[in-house]
């Protein structure tokens, strides 16, 4: 399945069912609170990501909390959104060490998430944030 190949490519860690259920519930809550077409579409893509990641992780009995139309609609937004984020963090990682593969898809515009990622990969937080902010200015699709 194409989605499983994509998840393998991103190489995100697999977690237990409880972790994925919590993640999916949090994304559903954010979707319910979203206002405006683009924000709703973006949050829908986050739900699709959480769901497909859980399925990829082996949790096959998890129920899709969206209609098929919503799923497909979210999928169309999810693939480029998360792939671009992943490529963004890979590029930042390579700026520290050509062998450093940062596998992250979090929103790089949220400073606290940048700090978490820097800690996870044992990188200087301030340098990581500065490089991220500088690169964000050139990556218009992440704005």
Cite the ranges covered by each PLM segment:
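Flexible "arm" and connector segments at domain edges
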Residues: 1-143
């Amino acid at each position: 399945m194409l989605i499983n190949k994509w998840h393998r490519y991103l190489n995100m860690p697999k977690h237990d069912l409880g972790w994925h259920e919590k993640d999916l519930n949090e994304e559903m809550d954010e979707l319910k609170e979203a206002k405006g077409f683009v924000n709703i579409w973006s949050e829908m893509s986050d739900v699709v990501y959480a769901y497909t990641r859980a399925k990829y992780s082996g949790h096959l009995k998890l129920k899709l909390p969206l209609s098929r139309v919503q799923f497909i609609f979210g999928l169309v937004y999810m693939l480029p959104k998360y792939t671009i984020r992943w490529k963004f963090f890979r590029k930042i990682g390579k700026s520290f060490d050509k062998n450093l593969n940062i596998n992250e898809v979090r929103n790089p515009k949220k400073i606290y998430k940048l700090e978490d990622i820097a800690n996870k990969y044992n990188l200087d937080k301030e340098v990581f944030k500065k490089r991220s902010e500088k690169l964000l200015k050139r990556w218009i699709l992440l704005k």
